[in-house]
Amino acid sequence: MELLERATPLPLAAAHPGVTVLALHGRMWRATRADGAVLGYVELLDTAEGERFLSKRLRPRAQGFLPVGEFWTADEAIESLRA
């Protein structure tokens, strides 16, 4: 069995009012609204250009995720989930 990395806070440079971010494991976070509704997820990726943050939503009634976009900062990834 593969061990998951220890959960760490998402490296946000700014506050995101109305959004709560919960670390799921070392490279994945869940973003929720104040009412508990899940906005989506942010995953840290290693790419040839450096680290990127992938924002994605869980697909309703289907398995897997729908990518929203890849971003250079965690703040951009969180903001993309507000739309």
Predicted region positions:
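Negatively charged, low-complexity tracts enriched in Asp/Glu with abundant Ser/Thr
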Residues: 1-34, 63-68
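Intrinsically disordered, low-complexity sequence elements enriched in Ser/Thr/Gly/Pro
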Residues: 4, 28-31, 50, 55, ...
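A broad, structure-centric signal for solvent-exposed, well-ordered loop/edge residues
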Residues: 8, 28, 38, 49, ...
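Compositionally biased, intrinsically disordered low-complexity segments
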Residues: 22-24, 45, 81
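Small-side-chain structural scaffolding
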Residues: 31, 40, 55, 69, ...
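Short aromatic-glycine-(Arg/Gly/Cys) micro-motifs in beta-strand/loop hairpins
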Residues: 39-64
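A short, charged, amphipathic alpha-helix used as a generic interaction element across diverse proteins
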Residues: 60-63, 69-83
